[in-house]
Amino acid sequence: RTAGFGFNAKSREAQRWATKFAGDRITTINTETKLAVRKIVVDSIREGIPPRDAAKQIREMVGLNRPQGLALRRYVQKLSPSLSPAAKAKAGIKLKNKMIRRRAITIARTEVIDSLSGGVEQAWVQAQQKGLLGSNAKKEWVTTPFGACAICRALNGQSVKITGMFSSEIGPL
């Protein structure tokens, strides 16, 4: 006999989570762009589109954030004075496009993973409500030493109740 419970990456819970929250943490974009990114994330989950492919769609919608814009400006200003204005512009455009690609993949990965995690959490709550998962069940923050930010690495191993929030230096997560 099976428990009658499961989760897959195309879950309705993850899609609902994405519909409600995807894009909320993206800075320096307007509401319309946020809604467009949200739709890409929902479609990505529903259709099983990998974050890298979703990022290709997102990069058409987002620009540089303030720190990236300042870094780009400094880069162009520090280029050799012997370069022609056209060569400087070309180098600047190349770096700008690279920065936007990086930003888009960061957004895609973060928003898809966050939505999938939110969907999993909703599935766990439903499992608890059905008596399939104990009321004392916990979730644990797991990171690898590579690719995770300092905030996430500091949370590694922390466990909280299923509906609880992890405590971080920037507040609850």
Give the label of every model feature segment.
Residues 1, 89-173:
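Activation/maturation switch segments at domain boundaries
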Residues 1-96:
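N-terminal leader/targeting and assembly helices and adjacent pre-domain segments
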